[in-house]
Amino acid sequence: MRKIYTSVEELIGGTPLLELRQIEQAEGLGATLLAKLEYLNPAGSAKDRVAKAMLDDAETKGLLKPGSVIIEPTSGNTGIGLAVVAATRGYRTIIVMPDTMSMERRLLMSAYGAELVLTPGAKGMAGSIEKAEELAREIPGSFIPGQFDNPANAAAHRATTGPEIWEDTQGKVDFFVAGVGTGGTITGTGEYLKAQNPNVKVIAVEPASSPLLSKGVAGPHGLQGIGANFVPKVLNTQVYDEIIPVTDEDAYAAGRQIGRKEGVLVGISSGAALWAAVQVAKRPENKGKTIVVLLPDTGDRYLSTPMFSE
């Protein structure tokens, strides 16, 4: 039976769960390890969900109208998602990002028609947010979706990602593991899963060299996409039961491993989440449990980074 879609937006969500059997075997895991493959969204990341949700919400509230200019500070994937959704709706888009983000991310956003403004990497996302706000004051009719503060971010995952995981596992999920960038994924998905079963354990993943959530200390790190060096308003700090810090090297190694063992090419933050999920799966008390790890994006936008340049 034929099914024809009329907009790329209709392809957002509904990503599959893949059991990582080769990694289970290689690591001697007694638990079942399931990966939520968010790179199968049309623009290659979980942020497609967020981009669509934030623009839908803004249009409904009258904050975004024909002729409006979208300005967003982002480390990359939200910018790519916004560029795609904005392209289908005819909005001009300006993305503000730290100059330390990968060249592939920059080129992708430009390919979808977004304009780029780069800020000093040393200032992190805070520097990009400051610049975006400055541009918004200068450009008439501009709108900042504000993924770090926008409730529509977490709401997107509460409405889609969480229910998809629950349905695909038929409610058999013991742990949910996700990195913390804006906090939208872990907040929305975690809240939904815990509402279905309060015994589901939610594990937050952060950079070991910027353990802001676990130790209150921020610092430079190589895990693009997580570890914003401030606590985002979107993040519900009550939703997670444990925080696992991951080193750059462990994240890179796990990211390479899933490509070589499972034929799944993912990005740096996916490597971090996967490494943490494997540690949870290795615990003797978790034998027979089901662990779902969310892998946020594709690896092809990181081929020039240390993860793949060995």
Q: Model-flagged regions — what are they?
A:
Residues 1-310:
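PLP-dependent amino-acid enzyme catalytic core
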